[in-house]
A protein has these predicted regions:
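Caspase-like (clan CD) cysteine peptidase catalytic core
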Residues: 52-54
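Charged catalytic cores and adjacent phosphate/nucleic-acid-binding surfaces used
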Residues: 8-18, 22, 29-47, 61-66, ...
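Phosphate-binding/switch loop-helix module in NTP-utilizing enzymes
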Residues: 56, 60
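Short glycine-rich, polar/acidic loop-and-turn segments at beta strand-coil junctions
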Residues: 1-2, 27-29
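Divalent metal-dependent hydrolysis catalytic cores, especially in the metallo-beta-lactamase
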Residues: 1-5, 70-72
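Histidine-centered divalent metal-coordination motifs
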Residues: 1, 75, 136
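Short beta-strand/loop segments at the ligand-binding rim of alpha/beta enzyme cores
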Residues: 67-77
Length: 186
C-alpha cells in the first residue's frame, strides 16, 4: 500500500526478461475515509504525493483526475475498515461512486459474495471492472486477471481505455491462504 516498490522491483530486476509481459504502474492508496483506492497515473508522471497515505478521498479524486490519472475502489465490499462501501465517505455521500473511473470487481483475497456485489455495483454505475490478486506474499501473485487489448502497452493507453468505459473480462481464483481465510471473518 502507498508504495510503488513492487513496480520499481519489476522495472529494475525483471522488465527485460519477458518483453511480452506488460506491467502497469499503479498504487493501492490507503485513504483517510474511504478505504483502499487503486490509482493509475500516466507513465511519465512522478507524483510522490501518492506515496503519502491518509489523504481524504474528496481530495484524492481531483488530484488524480487533474494529473490525468484514473482511480477506483479496491475490494469495495471487503473487510470493513479497508473497503469503500463500509467507509465514512460513502455513507456521507453515496453519489461519490460516480466520480470513480473503474471498480475492482474481482479480488483474489475476497469472498465470491464480495466480488459478486462489486460486479453488480460496476454494472449499476456503468464502470469498467478490473481484477487484482491483492498479493502481499509472492505465493499469491497471479490469482487474478483483467483482459485488455494487446495494443495497450502503457499506462496512458490503459487510462484512455478505461475512461471510455470499455468493458473488460476479469476473474481468477480465490486465494484461501489469507489470515482471514485461516482464522475466519472478523
Amino acid at each position: 500500500h502507498d508504495s510503488y516498490d513492487g513496480y520499481r522491483y519489476w522495472k529494475h530486476n525483471i522488465k527485460n526478461v519477458d518483453k511480452d509481459f506488460v506491467v502497469f504502474k499503479g498504487i493501492e492508496y490507503d485513504t483517510l475515509d474511504a478505504g483502499h483506492i487503486i490509482v493509475i497515473m500516466p507513465e511519465n508522471l512522478k507524483l510522490r504525493l501518492m506515496e503519502l497515505r491518509g489523504m481524504p478521498v474528496q481530495l484524492l479524486i481531483p488530484i488524480v483526475h487533474n494529473y490525468g490519472g484514473i482511480l477506483g475502489p479496491a475490494h469495495p465490499f471487503g473487510e470493513k475498515f479497508m473497503s469503500f462501501m463500509n467507509s465514512k465517505a460513502y455513507k456521507r455521500n453515496p453519489d461519490i461512486l460516480s466520480e470513480f473511473d473503474f471498480i475492482e470487481v474481482f479480488n483474489a483475497c475476497e469472498s465470491k459474495m464480495a466480488n459478486d456485489k462489486a460486479l453488480e455495483m460496476a454494472e449499476k454505475y456503468n464502470l469498467t471492472g478490473t481484477a487484482g490478486s491483492d498479493s502481499h506474499k509472492t505465493e499469491s501473485i497471479g490469482y487474478a486477471y483483467t483482459v485488455i487489448p494487446d495494443e495497450i502497452r502503457k499506462e496512458s493507453q490503459l487510462i484512455e481505455y478505461i475512461k471510455h468505459r470499455n468493458k473488460t473480462e476479469c476473474g481468477g481464483k480465490i486465494y484461501e491462504n489469507t489470515s482471514r481465510g485461516k482464522l475466519g471473518k472478523a
